[in-house]
Amino acid sequence: MKITVWSLTVEYEDVLETYVFATEDEAIKDLRKWFRADHDQWKTWHDEPAPFEQDELDDLTDSDFQSLLNDYDVTNEIKPHELEV
């Protein structure tokens, strides 16, 4: 039997992490939870206010959210993997 799992890989500054999810929706939900509006990666300096309100980020499509992360030097990839079980 074959199943599909989804990996989320995120890289920024000195962070490189990969997680596996049962669905693509779970992966994007985790990515959005990770990079809330108050995350330091959005800020030029750590003590500055965030450039976005959380509502603004929530209103973005998943694709636009991922593109915005790339603009802020957060490489992120969600892709399927078919496994034989």
Swiss-Prot record:
Q: What is this protein's name?
A: Gene 73 protein
This protein's encoding gene: 73
